[in-house]
């Protein structure tokens, strides 16, 4: 099994080593399944693409688990049970047997490296696909060889053709020299092994790995807004991931150890109530309301407790303000020019599930934040963005408009994949 698909996204051409390539059947392609491992839940989706852009979800499974923190799972048995449960639910609802899944990789288990490369073509001639492959492979050789990591995908950020910058694939262009900046995404081997151990009980294999942030960013942020660096802020339950995306590649990735859990934890400590009661208060909270002289009754196993709405507001807004400051500083560290007013999208359920959360963050950061989760008949809330982003990414990869061209180049791609595999086995 190969876990290092080689992707070229610049011209919508994506070649991967997924075990089951897409098939067109009656206007739709063969269903694909993804497994999205979040910081508090696991989501399995089975869907297919219709009419090029539409996605039909045949089945979905969602299971909560203990989560992960600082790049480590808090309870592997809890994760194991959640993976098995959500795949079973998806199979039952879709009435399809899932044999393999595309696995999303959270930022905590991913590593990003940007490397450039240049090739001289000698006398001026047409750039061929093989030249682009060689560019990407040369840039990969500059990446750090760290034990315990495997390549997920490599995506060109931009090309330089005889000194002229271009985001288009240079195939067929006449040039003497071609350069490229390439985004290489790696996945921690231990992450793959842990998930595969759970899937082994079901007879399911991992067909490919996809960066959760890349799939989500490409789905949410329009192409024209990714011509210059754009930002995706995913505020989850245990952490906040910040990704910088340019064209169809990630150029920056960072994680902050703050999410929806910390809001509830602060309430639990500050109000001296159990986490369950704190979660209830958090979910009912609305930013920017005048809570003077109002109280709320929190029900616990030991009875009821009356607390001041002002106290709840103070605790939540203090944590939200702190998170906003951390996000701003992290974006600046990643090289984002905030004065240029970049496109910034927000997803995840850690803050957006609280009413008024987006407006609070927008005002705190003084940036035109956007929330643009595509409408779906179900699971349309922002905490499912990464799952739908992965499904969208995989389905489009399998239904490339240049499918016939990809088939003709299978041998070339397979040879390159073998070179990449050998590179990491040295």
Ranges and model annotations:
Residues 1-41, 46-230, 274-276, 288-313, ...:
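Nucleotide/phosphate-binding catalytic cleft detector across ATP-hydrolyzing
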Residues 35, 44, 103, 199, ...:
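Residue-level signature of catalytic and energy-coupling elements of molecular machines
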Residues 35-41, 105-107, 232-239, 245-248, ...:
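A short acidic Gly-Thr/Ser loop motif
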Residues 50, 225-226, 247, 360-366:
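Short, solvent-exposed amphipathic alpha-helical segments in soluble enzyme
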Residues 129, 362-388:
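Conserved phosphate-binding/catalytic loops in two-lobed NTP-binding clefts
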Residues 221-290:
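Acidic, glycine-rich loop-and-beta core segments that form the ion-binding/anion-interacting portion
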Residues 286-289, 339-360:
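Glycine-rich phosphate-binding loops at beta-strand->alpha-helix junctions
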Residues 310-322:
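Glycine-rich phosphate-binding "P-loop"
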């Amino acid at each position: 099994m190969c876990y290092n698909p080689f992707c070229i996204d610049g011209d919508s051409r994506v070649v991967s080593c997924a075990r089951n390539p897409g098939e067109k059947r009656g206007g739709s392609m063969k269903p694909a399944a993804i497994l999205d491992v979040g910081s508090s839940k696991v989501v399995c989706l089975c869907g297919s693409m219709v009419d090029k852009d539409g996605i039909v979800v045949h089945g979905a499974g969602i299971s909560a688990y203990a989560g992960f923190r600082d790049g480590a799972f808090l309870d592997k048995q809890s994760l194991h049970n959640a993976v098995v449960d959500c795949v079973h639910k998806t199979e039952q609802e879709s009435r399809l047997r899932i044999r393999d899944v595309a696995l999303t990789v959270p930022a905590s288990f991913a590593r990003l490296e940007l490397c450039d490369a240049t090739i001289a073509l000698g006398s001026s001639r047409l750039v061929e696909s093989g030249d682009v492959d060689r560019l990407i492979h040369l840039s990969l050789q500059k990446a750090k060889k760290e034990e315990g990591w495997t390549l997920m995908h490599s995506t060109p950020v931009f090309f330089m053709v005889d000194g002229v910058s271009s985001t288009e694939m240079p195939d067929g262009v006449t040039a003497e020299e071609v350069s490229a900046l390439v985004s290489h995404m790696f996945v921690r081997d231990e992450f793959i092994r842990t998930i595969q151990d759970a899937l082994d009980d079901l007879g399911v294999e991992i067909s490919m790995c996809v960066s959760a942030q890349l799939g989500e960013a490409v789905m949410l942020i329009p192409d024209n807004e990714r011509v210059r660096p754009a930002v995706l802020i995913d505020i989850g339950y245990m952490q906040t991931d910040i990704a910088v995306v340019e064209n169809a590649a990630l150029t920056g990735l960072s994680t902050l150890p703050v999410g929806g859990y910390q809001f509830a934890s602060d309430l639990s400590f500050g109000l001296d109530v159990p986490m369950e009661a704190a979660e209830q208060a958090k979910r009912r909270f609305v930013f920017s309301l005048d809570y003077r002289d109002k109280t709320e009754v929190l029900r616990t196993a030991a009875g009821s407790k009356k607390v001041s709405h002002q106290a709840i507001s103070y605790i939540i807004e203090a944590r939200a303000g702190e998170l906003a400051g951390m996000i701003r500083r992290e974006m600046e560290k990643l090289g984002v020019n905030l004065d240029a007013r970049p496109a910034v999208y927000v997803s995840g359920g850690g803050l957006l599930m609280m009413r008024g959360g987006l407006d609070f963050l927008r005002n705190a950061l003084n940036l035109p934040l956007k929330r643009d989760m595509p409408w779906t008949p179900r699971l349309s809330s922002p905490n499912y963005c990464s799952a739908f982003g992965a499904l969208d990414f995989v389905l489009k990869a399998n239904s490339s408009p240049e499918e016939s061209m990809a088939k003709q180049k299978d041998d070339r791609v397979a040879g390159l994949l073998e070179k990449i595999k050998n590179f990491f086995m040295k």
